[in-house]
Amino acid sequence: MITTDHPHRERAEQRRKFVPPSRLHLPDVPDRAEDALLDQLLYATADGCQDCRSMLLDRFAQDAGATHKLVDWACWIATEVYGGLPAELVDEAATADTLFRPSLTFCRLAAEYRARGRTSSGMYTAREPAQRREAADTAVTLVAGLQRCWTDFLYR
């Protein structure tokens, strides 16, 4: 198990708080002991700590299960916020009109989530670590942005 040299925690002053990945049970994604590290990635992103973000994203790029949980978690939250996944998160062409640019890998995974209400583990194991890293990065950036800006995040 890896840790950072300093902790990141949920901020008390944050107006909107989403259930962190470690406390959310997604029916088609197994819960794991390392899920608390996923929380650290969210908090490091919210704190703007690039060193921790980079280290944790590198770790999760090697872990298809962690990326699976992050992407499904982000898709679940975005679905709740927007009443469904907006085209800007699933259609590569639609992202051109937004400041937030989800990765191509995230868009493809989100499109699957939109169609089926979940993604499958095989979709993550079939991807290269670099693709999993970019999908995880997009997922956590999306949730941190929604926490900060709510529905305006995609359209600022």
Label the model's feature ranges.
Residues 1-156:
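C-terminal-biased regions
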